[in-house]
């Protein structure tokens, strides 16, 4: 069985983002999403017009691999190094990502039935886990078709 960690993260996140954009109507960028920054030390909003779906797919992957997690833990997961000081010459510091974007995405994923909330934070529902597993298996099959030496890492097709 192919798991999420068996396929490249960038390919998986792009495919899940495309699926969310096309098939999950509950996950939509709010009106303020086109002018919001993703962290306090960022100077501009993201350049990718579909960044909301990419971040939602990335949150799903992080919950699959490291869940359950809350907004604070995900803020730390999306943190970045920032230059500080008047002339930006002091050593860099870690800055946590903004919480509003992550919180709103988690709320939308809850409405879609892909994430559930409990006392330990948010975790994937069985539907969310099976969605990621199905997309990962599809990606693994496509990669194995492109590079036959990867066949040994995928399960044989049923009926053979």
Regions found by a protein language model. Give the residues of each.
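Long, low-complexity, charged/polar intrinsically disordered regions in eukaryotic proteins
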Residues: 1-57, 61
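Long, charge-rich, low-complexity intrinsically disordered regions
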Residues: 25-27, 49, 76, 94, ...
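Short amphipathic alpha-helical elements of helix-turn-helix/winged-helix folds
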Residues: 58-66, 77
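Short acidic, hydrophobic short linear motifs in intrinsically disordered regions
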Residues: 68-93
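Short, hydrophobic-biased segments on the C-terminal half of alpha helices
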Residues: 71, 102-107
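Residue-level detection of the helix-turn-helix DNA-binding "recognition helix"
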Residues: 79, 107, 133, 137
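A short, conserved structural fragment
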Residues: 107-120
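Short, amphipathic alpha-helical interaction segments positioned at domain boundaries
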Residues: 126-160
């Amino acid at each position: 069985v192919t798991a999420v960690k068996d396929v490249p993260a960038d390919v998986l996140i792009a495919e899940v983002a495309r699926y969310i954009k096309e098939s999950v109507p509950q996950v939509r960028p709010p009106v303020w999403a086109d002018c919001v920054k993703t962290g306090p030390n960022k100077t501009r909003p993201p350049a990718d017009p579909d960044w909301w779906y990419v971040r939602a797919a990335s949150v799903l992957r992080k919950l699959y691999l490291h869940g359950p997690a809350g907004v604070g833990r995900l803020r730390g997961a999306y943190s970045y190094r920032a230059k500080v000081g008047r002339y930006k010459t002091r050593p860099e510091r870690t800055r946590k990502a903004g919480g509003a974007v992550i919180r709103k995405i988690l709320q939308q994923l809850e409405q879609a039935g892909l994430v559930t909330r409990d006392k330990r934070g948010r975790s994937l529902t069985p539907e969310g886990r099976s969605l990621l597993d199905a997309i990962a298996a599809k990606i693994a099959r496509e990669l194995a078709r492109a590079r036959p030496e990867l066949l040994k890492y995928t399960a044989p097709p049923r009926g053979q």
